[in-house]
A protein has these predicted regions:
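Membrane-embedded helix-loop-helix hairpins and adjacent transmembrane boundary segments
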Residues: 1-534
């Protein structure tokens, strides 16, 4: 049997076992949506890290660094710094005021139906963007490993089915433990791969960085080029490159605090103190991991080479090909299985956040106006919606094809989260005057601005030469109207402006009256949701 397939099957068997165990403990909404709020701080911290260290991190960032050096490393810096926003601003108030979703915080003192409807739409949009990136990575990875045994489309469908199984049967508890197992494996594999890279250079940083400054590759004209990968400019070139880099940084740093699948993790712990504790655990793991992406990306550039990577799966396969070059096919299979585990864990987290938002926010509190529903209906709706969300993600990933860089796709999801979700969360918690009109306007403007600018950016809009065919061609064959690849530098301020203007042109005395209650609860935890009894 193909050793890669064997390792895949072993991991799938382990995770299905976890799902079966969790399914026996996921009775009731609190157990299904929030794991009974009984996850310990260190467990949730590892799970948060597992949720955050996605295919974009392991496959995408390594690939961008391998091809674009210093500019690619800026992705690592942005994702690393981002958790300071979560720790200092979001984690404690969110845990104290919410129940299952981001919209719970907004609905605490605002009119629930309009804010939940818009927040649910935003959650589904961000989750779908993020999920598509993971599915693209999964399809490309499995196709590379198993060769002619499966097609890219079949690989994407298989991952989608597994994702749906985890969520439908295991809920948040299964998702949490799949993420913990995956995070431990990913850290172990990344540490080992980093050590092997440095061993290749005799543990000499001088040799390592010397090799990086002399990376050789062929450009689009077929000319061999030697470039210093430690210098900026390979990706972000003048005149708009510096602005694009700032825009990327804004999206990554502020987007994390608006990612639905990260925010819902803080509802799985008993209290706000444990939520803060879990963020510290996550930051230690995430910080270590993103430092090591330097070794993975630059190691792939110097040891494997951009030309070889381009001809064997593209940028997303840089880390697995590095493992193969350093330690042969068995280690290649092991690292690829870890990458596969990474994808499965993250898509499960994304799906549970999307289905929870649809079921709890839209179905129960918008369609049925918060009326008491029969026991188990909310969970049943979430399980059914998992099939719909999974099907949409599978379809779009198949249309995009295996060549899209997953780190870049995820960066766009961060831009949408930072533009739509973060402004309304921050203003709801910290601004007394903030009201329902401001929340709805902020969410709508943030969503429309970020998605609209993405559609008319060079990411999707460009005139390709006739030699570029298939999925490599841009979606819209015209000159881009917006010069930056990432819209964050414009769409994030627009999200805040929309929320502020919407608030100032309307009045809602009840929202202001409930602000003191929200302030006390968000800072003290009085009245916060308690852990479920078992």
């Amino acid at each position: 049997m193909n050793i890669s397939l064997l390792m895949f099957l072993i991991f799938i068997a382990i995770t299905l076992g976890i799902t079966y165990w969790a399914s026996r403990r996921s009775a009731g909404a609190a157990a299904y949506f929030a794991a009974g709020r009984q996850i310990k701080g260190w467990q949730n911290g590892i799970a948060v890290a597992g949720d955050y260290m996605s295919a974009a991190s392991f496959l995408g960032i390594a690939g961008i660094i391998a091809f674009q050096g210093y500019d690619g490393f800026m992705f690592s810096v942005g994702w690393l710094v981002a958790y300071l926003t979560v720790l200092l601003v979001i984690a404690e108030p969110l845990r104290n005021t919410g129940k299952y979703t981001m919209a719970d915080v907004l609905a605490y003192r605002l009119k629930p139906r309009p804010v939940r409807a818009m927040a649910s739409l935003s959650t589904l949009t961000v989750s779908t963007f993020y999920m598509i990136a993971q599915m693209v990575g999964a399809g490309a990875l499995v196709k590379l490993l198993l060769g002619n045994m499966v097609t890219y489309n079949e690989a994407v469908i298989a991952v989608g089915i597994l994702m749906i199984v985890y969520v439908v049967f295991g809920g948040m508890l299964a998702t949490t433990w799949v993420q913990i197992v995956k995070a431990v494996l990913l850290m172990a594999g990344t540490i080992l791969l980093s050590i092997l890279v440095m061993a290749h250079f005799h543990f000499s940083f001088g040799q390592f960085f010397g090799a990086i400054s002399q990376v050789s590759y062929h450009d689009v004209k077929g000319t061999q080029v030697v470039r210093d990968f430690l210098q900026p400019g390979l990706r972000y070139k003048p005149p708009y490159g510096p602005l694009d880099l700032i825009s990327l940084g804004m999206a990554l740093i502020f987007g994390t605090a608006g990612l639905p699948h990260i925010l819902v993790r803080f509802y799985t712990v008993p209290d706000a103190k444990t939520a803060r504790h879990s963020v510290v655990w996550a930051m230690v793991l995430i910080g270590s991991f993103y430092i090591m992406t330097t070794f993975l990306g630059f190691g792939a550039a110097t040891i494997v080479g951009p030309d070889y990577i381009k001809g064997h799966g593209g940028t997303n396969m840089s880390a697995p090909l590095l493992a193969q070059a350093l330690a042969g096919n068995i280690f290649f299979a092991f690292i690829s299985a870890i990458a596969f585990a990474t994808i499965l864990a993250v898509v499960a987290g994304l799906t549970i956040s999307a289905t929870t938002s649809f079921s709890h926010d839209f179905w129960t509190n918008v369609i049925h106006n918060g009326e008491e529903r029969r026991a188990g209906e909310e969970v049943l709706v979430a399980r059914i919606s998992a099939f719909v969300v999974g099907g949409v993600a599978i379809g779009i990933a198949i249309v995009l094809g295996p060549t899209a860089n997953v780190a870049f796709l995820v960066a766009l999801a961060f831009a949408v989260a930072a533009s739509a979700n973060l402004p309304v969360i921050v203003l709801s918690i910290f601004w007394r005057r903030f009201n329902t009109a401001g929340a709805v306007t902020g969410l709508a403007v943030g969503l429309l601005a970020s998605i609209g600018l993405i559609l008319v950016s060079p990411s999707l809009m460009a005139i390709d030469p006739p030699t570029v065919v298939g999925t490599a061609r841009h979606l819209i064959q015209a000159k881009a109207w917006f010069p930056l690849e990432n819209p964050g530098i414009l769409s994030i301020p627009l999200g805040f402006i929309g929320a502020i203007v919407g608030t100032l042109i309307s009045s809602e005395p009840t929202a202001q009256e409930k602000f003191n209650e929200l302030l006390v609860r968000s800072n003290t935890g009085l009245g916060a949701e308690k852990a479920a009894a078992h």
